[in-house]
Amino acid sequence: MGKIQELSPELINQIAAGEVIESAHSVVKELMENSMDASATQVDVESKDGGLSLLRITDNGTGIEPEDLEPALKRHATSKIQDYKDLESVLSYGFRGEALASIASVSRLTLESGTKEQKTAWKTRSVAGKISEKEEIPGFIGTKILVEELFFNTPVRRKFLKSIRSEDKKIRDRVTTQALAREDVRFRLFQDGKEVFVLPTRENKKERIIDLFGENFRDHLLEVSLERGGIQATGYISDPDFYKSNRTGQFIFINGRPIEIKYSSVLLKKAYDELLPPNGHPYCFLFFEIDPSRVDVNVHPAKREIRFLDEDGFNGFFLALIQKELRSSTPVSFLELKKRLLKPAPETHSTTSFYQARSSGKNPLLGRELFSGVSKQEGFELDRMGPGVSLSELTDERVKHSSFVPKKHFGVLFETFILAEAEDGFYIIDQHTAHERIRYEEVLRKLEKRNYGIQPLLTPIRIDVSKQEQEDILNRKKEYEEVGIFLDPLGEDSIVLREIPAYMEPGQEKEIVLDFLNRTEGKETSEPELYDLMAKCVACRSAIKKGDQLSDPILAEILNRLSYCENPSRCPHGRPTLVKLSRDDLERMFHRK
């Protein structure tokens, strides 16, 4: 008997499911798209235990004819296309005929559907792809699909899934994305018996965006539109003062389909040019209509990606769409806007977006001491950063970890690089990354030992968020309190920061907390990972900057503290803090050896 064997249909379907069905959120996506193709105007999504125990999608679409129930659960059976020419002009969400069969092959699935032509509806079941006979049930119009025990027959797949909370968030994100594409459809989402949101139909996309992301978006959205070269685009982008520190606020649709476009975030950054800081990413909700023959949606089994016939042409159109509105909506030049962005922000605790974490652009340390006065017992302490770590404490706890033992310094080059001599050579030290390493290790040590106090804010800080974001943050309330961040709900779409850890200096807490929330958004983090992220946020925001004027005592203190760091050669993000030239290096350079 030969070694090459034909695979069974069941195994073929399970392999196909691995490409199409990543987890419960993939099931939700595929079934909602079927509802859209069936002209549904109402879609209900229910999940239990992150969708692994139960998923139910109910719609009021056109329904499935009785004779089509069984074929609908078979692989490569579809009503969307008939030949290759149809594939070249596909406008429906689904067309591959894989989704239902893939879902059925890894779950216990019940399919109920009725049409307006039928007085009764019909039901069929599938267990791991094995379809039972259909049966007649009381009539209704639409389709109900119940998916139970997802991946029950592929336990390895379950092992790779994240926590229930993480899977719940992915489902919410999927429904959110689909709801953005179809404001003319009412969506309801329930998770573990709790109503997450009800989205009524809307007349325009802006109202749907506000429903999902919060009222604070209303005054920060710029409408965009452009038509040329066979492409039509509409949508909204955020103004330059409203942005995130990650790309999760960017939604792009091609012919109604949510798509991941290669380099889209790069194009957005290029379009905004100088209007955003390096770590700022704008929101965008963009909807493109393109002749289907000019795009290939059959690139990925899950239909996440798309290929353009003229990619360069599309990229040029994309840039023009964004830049046109930014220029027309801004009465001053890009250069003037850049100057405005670099002005210090007013000292106020006014409302700010959850994702808006802009630095004032001016380092408050300029023109004043970075360290407090000298104490022979405790050494210098960092100014504006709360209590630092004394040199006596460092000496008691550990020894120096490298041969970097500074003897004297010679000043600063280009207002950035400290020049110093040590036992083993000549060093050039980046003042920012060096101080960042110092602050990172100090804060991390305090967190690990829980050696810090909590201080209330005289004026609590309000942070506007969407309902979903508020729920996500409050679900992690206890985790955030482990690093000294105390957040409470304020209404339905805000949170309030009332207390902060003493390792933060008042005046920086807003930027640090917003940065921390952004870095932890949607991520499963252990306690050590939370400590690491918080220490990095504090270090990044509080470290002295390039161009800060440093006195001789401050320079000496930076070098001394750096020599006690566990890893003095790198900042927390991996950039070098110092470059060494040994005596041998110098002598070889001058041909003395």
UniProtKB/Swiss-Prot annotation:
The keyword DNA damage applies. SUPFAM superfamilies: ATPase domain of HSP90 chaperone/DNA topoisomerase II/histidine kinase, DNA mismatch repair protein MutL, Ribosomal protein S5 domain 2-like. Signal peptide: none annotated. One of its GO terms (cellular component) is mismatch repair complex. It holds the Pfam family HATPase_c_3. Keywords: DNA damage, DNA repair. InterPro entries: DNA_mismatch_repair_CS, DNA_mismatch_repair_MutL, DNA_mismatch_S5_2-like, HATPase_C_sf, MutL/Mlh/PMS, MutL/Mlh/Pms-like, MutL_C, MutL_C_dimsub. Belongs to the DNA mismatch repair MutL/HexB family. NCBIfam families: mutl. This protein is involved in the repair of mismatches in DNA. It is required for dam-dependent methyl-directed DNA mismatch repair. May act as a 'molecular matchmaker', a protein that promotes the formation of a stable complex between two or more DNA-binding proteins in an ATP-dependent manner without itself being part of a final effector complex. This is DNA mismatch repair protein MutL. It comes from Leptospira interrogans serogroup Icterohaemorrhagiae serovar Lai (strain 56601). The lineage of its organism: Bacteria, Pseudomonadati, Spirochaetota, Spirochaetia, Leptospirales.
